Amino acid sequence: MSPDCLDEALVAAAQAGSSEAFSRLVERHQQALRAFLRRACGNWAQADDLAQETFLAAWSRIGRLKAGASVRAWLCGIGYNKHLSAVRSGARDRIREASYEADRETARGADAADRMALEAAMGDLPVEQRACVALCLAADFSHAEASEALGLPLGTVKSHVTRGRSRLLQALGGPDGR
C-alpha cells in the first residue's frame, strides 16, 4: 500500500473514531512536523510543545480533513498557525533562551558551529519567510504543498523561498556574493 493510500485509510478510520488510527498518523508524521516547527521557531523545546498542541488540535479537527488532502501539509498548517499564535502572544520571547547544548542532534554534514550559524540566520528571517524556507528547502515540500500548508498564495511562497534563500546565503557568506 502506498504511503498516501495508507494515510487515506488511517484518516478514514480516525474520522470514524479510531484513536489507534490517529496514533499511527501521529507516528508517521511527527518527525516531519517537529523538524518543520524546530526550523520555524528555532527552539526545540517550544517546537516539541507546539507539535503536541498541533496533534491535540488535529485530533479534534480530524473530521474536517478532506478526502485526498495531504496529511503532512494539513498538520504543518495547523502547526504553523500554533506557532504564529505563540509568536503573537509573546511566548517566543519567554521561551527564547537558546539552549544550544540541549540541541545534541547535528544537521547532516554540518558541525555545531555551522548549525548554530544557520539557526541564527533562520531566526533573523521574517516568520512567514522562515516557514516557507523550512518547508521547501529543509522539509522538501513542493511550493504547492507549502502554499497549502501555510495558507499562502503560491506566488508568495515562491517569493519567500527565493528571498529567504538569498538572505541565508548572505548571512552565511554564501557563493552568490550578496
Language-model segments: residues:
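N-terminal module of bacterial RNA polymerase sigma factors
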Residues: M1-A32, R39, G123, Q170
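C-terminal edge and immediately downstream basic/flexible tail or linker adjoining helix-turn-helix-like DNA-binding
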Residues: M1-S2, A13, G42, A120, ...
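Internal acidic/polar
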Residues: P3-D7, S85, R92-A120, S142
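Short, charged helix-capping/linker segments at alpha-helix termini
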Residues: Q15-R24, R34-E53, K66, D176-R178
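Structural recognition of an alpha-helix C-terminal capping motif at a helix-to-coil junction
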Residues: A35, D49-L56, S60, A69-N81
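Helix-turn-helix DNA-binding motif, specifically the short coil turn and the N-cap/start of the second
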Residues: N43, S142, G151-T156
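Arg/Lys-rich amphipathic alpha helix in sigma70-family domain 2
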Residues: S60-A67, G77-A98, D111
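A short pre-motif secondary-structure segment
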Residues: C132-C136
